[in-house]
Amino acid sequence: LVGSEMCIRDRYKGVDPQLSLDMLMRLQTKAPDDNRISKELADVYYTMGQYGKAKEAYESYLKVGTPTEQDYTRYAMLLYLNKDYAQSSDMAKKGLELAPENHVLKRLAMYDNLELKDYKEGLEAAATFFSNPGNPDYVYLDYVYFARLLEADKQYDEAVAQFDKALAMDKSHTEIYKDISDVYEKERDFPKAIEAYKNYLGGMKGDPDISDLFLYGRLNYYAATDSAYQDKQPLYLAEADTIFAQVAAKVPDNYLGNFWRARVNSLRDPETTQGLAKPYYEAALSILEQKPDATKSVLVECNSYLGYYYFVKEDYNQSKLYWNKILEIDPGNETATKALQGIK
């Protein structure tokens, strides 16, 4: 009876997975020791995208069954999708012992090792996976994972080349430009990092979110602070100031927009003679002082600037107010202590 019902189930497996699933559940009630049902359940759950249940069914089957190449492939993929990268890697290795040329298993070996941060093994797996460049089954994400392995190994030029291959394969994935920007930033090649980030922002279908804007502004700020690009510092500072102003306007209860505008304008006024950063440090401080968990170093920076600003303006009482605030936050702060001694 079970055998004939399994045949009927096979007819509906691809047409109506839910019907197939219902039949298998009834079969399992009738024959709970028939391990074939666990495997079939795993296949149906996999088809339906219910990966957690498919994983459980495969685990039940593999306890007593003899896995095939397809079993290893699907189970390793399920484990990967469930973020169980170590076990997925183990299954991929076992599957490759059975089927050394299995394309999906070779892919998973590379993907899993990246997630496990085993970059040496990952690069070896990538070399195996890409050993047949004419294979038509590569997808853009394969090049992304390879690029990230190379980036982790500090092979930055080759990483960018692989990210470029991913984009060439599928230009719709403009988020890859952000990866490229990150690589250039690590190399401190800020002009290229900024160009790539602009491409990332330009490829968005909607408006960029606050974190994307903030990171773009910060990238311009870092470029402005790098001595290699001092000829372009005014341009980078102007762009950073514009972006951080947008951040401050979009999230007025968050200190970051004003705080980074303060840093930008402090660079524009290195002697603090104009007080360009003053209104932004004040705005950031007014927000931070309402937060019990505010970062100490950020509070110290805001108060330090304002203390020094009033010192330059010879408003010593106001200057002392800010230096004393620092000592309330950080009693051992040497800069504040020396500043107060100097005012006396």
Predicted feature locations:
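Residue-level recognition of tetratricopeptide repeat
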Residues: 9-10, 43, 77, 111, ...
